[in-house]
Swiss-Prot record:
Single Gene Ontology BP annotation: translation
Quaternary organization: Part of the 50S ribosomal subunit.
PANTHER family (alphabetical): 54S RIBOSOMAL PROTEIN L1, MITOCHONDRIAL (PTHR36427), LARGE RIBOSOMAL SUBUNIT PROTEIN UL1M (PTHR36427:SF3)
PROSITE patterns named in the record: RIBOSOMAL_L1
HAMAP family: Ribosomal_uL1_B (MF_01318_B)
Range of residues in the leader sequence: none
Lineage: Bacteria, Pseudomonadati, Pseudomonadota, Alphaproteobacteria, Candidatus Pelagibacterales
InterPro entries: Ribosom_uL1_bac-type, Ribosomal_uL1, Ribosomal_uL1-like, Ribosomal_uL1/biogenesis, Ribosomal_uL1_3-a/b-sand, Ribosomal_uL1_CS
Identification of the protein by name: Large ribosomal subunit protein uL1
SUPFAM superfamilies: Ribosomal protein L1
GO CC annotations, alphabetized: large ribosomal subunit
């Protein structure tokens, strides 16, 4: 039986469009009636059925409004770069001894960054890091000589954009407690990233078929982007 809170939500859960995203964000936040700080999420349907094979997107976006989450960042680097990593805010910094701990299953971090030189050693730990989604990836900015920038990006707020086998992408733009300006900046940063991805692909038609916005426990609204991506 539907709860009292659910009954108070709008009846339509789809096909509600908005030309002005600011108005839609206000509506989504208004429907966040639970006691916890609900996440505001975007979902995209990708036009991934192409004659030349499926479209696979995997990239990362730096969210100017942040994510509202504290990320524990670990860095595997040469000793000469250890201070740079610590000064940038890395929670754990190490080299060969740290790699041995990772091999033993000590994965007390949420993001792993390394230098290209150390990636050769970490690549042998695919069975340990891969299933947890922790293997550093140059395309995602987690393999870099510029350790300071990589750590800063990870700490300030990043989101991975990746479609599943059915062509769906899910990504959070923040929390109910965020100011509208934070959510807007994150929203547009994600769209800009998808637009760049489209430019790197050979497509027939648009990359994105449909876009929806919702909160953790709210209804889903269809977003009219105003431009084709």
């Amino acid at each position: 039986m539907p709860s009292k809170r659910f009954k108070q939500l709008p009846e339509k859960t789809k096909d509600l469009t908005a030309d002005v995203i600011e108005n839609l964000l206000a509506t989504v936040k208004k429907n966040c009636t639970t006691k916890f700080d609900e996440s505001i999420d975007l979902s995209f349907q990708v036009n991934n059925k192409q004659k030349k094979g499926e479209v696979n997107i995997r990239t990362v976006v730096n969210l100017p409004g942040g994510t509202g989450k504290k990320v524990k960042v670990a860095v595997v680097c040469e000793d000469t770069k250890a201070k740079e990593a610590k000064d940038a805010g890395a929670d754990i910094v190490g080299s060969d001894e740290f790699i041995d701990k990772i091999k033993a299953g000590e994965l007390n971090f949420e993001k792993l960054i390394c230098t290209p030189g150390m990636m050769v050693k970490l690549s042998k730990l695919g069975k340990v890091l891969g299933p947890k989604g922790l293997m550093p990836n140059p395309k995602l900015g987690s393999v870099s000589e510029d350790i300071k920038q990589a750590v800063t990006n990870a700490k300030s707020g990043q989101a991975e954009i990746r479609n599943d086998k059915d062509g769906n992408i899910g990504v959070s733009i923040g929390k109910k407690s965020f100011h509208d300006d934070q959510l807007l900046k994150n929203f547009h940063a994600i769209l800009d990233t998808l637009e760049k991805e489209k430019g790197n692909l050979t497509l027939k038609g648009d990359l994105i078929k449909n876009t929806f916005i919702t909160s953790s426990m709210g209804v889903s609204y269809k977003v009219k982007l105003g431009k084709a991506i």
